[in-house]
Amino acid sequence: MNENQAIINIETTGIDPHKNHIYLINIFTIDRYYNFYSKNNESEEKIIKSAYKILQNKQIISFSEFDIKFINTKLIIYTEFDVINNCIYLQKLIRNYYNSQLSSLKAKDLAANLFDINIDDKSKSVKLYKKISKSNRISDELIEFSKTSMNFKIKLYNYMRKFFEENCAKFDVYSNFVRYLLYDIKKIKNNLEISLITDNKMEIDAMYESTQIKSQGMFITLCLSLHEGYIEDDFVECTMTSMDNNYNLINNYYPLVINGEFIYDNIKELVKYTLTEIFNE
């Protein structure tokens, strides 16, 4: 972790940012730990503005997209600040490499399975919040709950940093090695959008055959068109279809999505091949 990053944890009274509110924000930076508590709806705006002053120029590390989407909705409601968009979501990273090994990717289950940390159910923290709303005093239980939740996120971040060091792939750009991991995959109509997280900022805007590659900060995105078809049960014969013609699948075609499920090993090989072809020409 460096001085330009911050790990964030929030607790809310529900899942709808228009109806519910944030009552706790924890921020962990390289040299400080911040706690912001809201005892009622009226003080929510104050803690959000205070937290934003710390976060505005940093890369935010969050467990999932929920926290950032919730905060961004509140920023739009209360302020004219820019929304937070420089983020790393730990759940996305772990999904690509441990999805088949873990029965659940929920924070509570990951905390228990990976670190033997017990994160109480969210409903318990909401009950604790309702108590302090009446008493006007932050309870020790709520403070401990937030510390445990943040401790899990810090451990998961360090866990994935170690995983990056041990498992990252590499490609060469102008005699410099760039290390990366698969970060996110989205299927948008007949296109596949593949995001990589790297260990370095770079500027890339290139095309390789039908694949477009662009970079933004520490992220690289590959966008390619998918051919749709069907695969026999034994995966030996496959017919690819387009609007104009039908043709048989040849040996160097690899399925990337089957029945809506991403084939991660094939996607990783495609990324490796594409990057090598582009930058080693």
Placement of each model-derived feature along the sequence:
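Residue-level signal for well-ordered alpha-helical scaffold segments within enzymatic catalytic domains
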Residues: 6, 24, 53, 69-73, ...
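Short, well-structured alpha-helical interface segments that form or flank functional binding sites
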Residues: 20, 46, 66, 141, ...
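Acidic, Mg2+-coordinating catalytic module of metal-dependent nucleases/exonucleases
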Residues: 110-174
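Polyanion-binding interface signature
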Residues: 169-265
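Conserved DEDDh/DEDDy metal-dependent 3′-5′ exonuclease domain
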Residues: 31-106, 259-281
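Active-site-proximal flexible loops/turns
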Residues: 16-18, 74, 96, 156
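Acidic active-site catalytic centers that drive phospho-/nucleotidyl reactions
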Residues: 9-11, 67, 89, 149
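Conserved RNase H-like, two-metal-ion catalytic cores of nucleic-acid enzymes
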Residues: 1-55, 196-202, 211-231, 235, ...
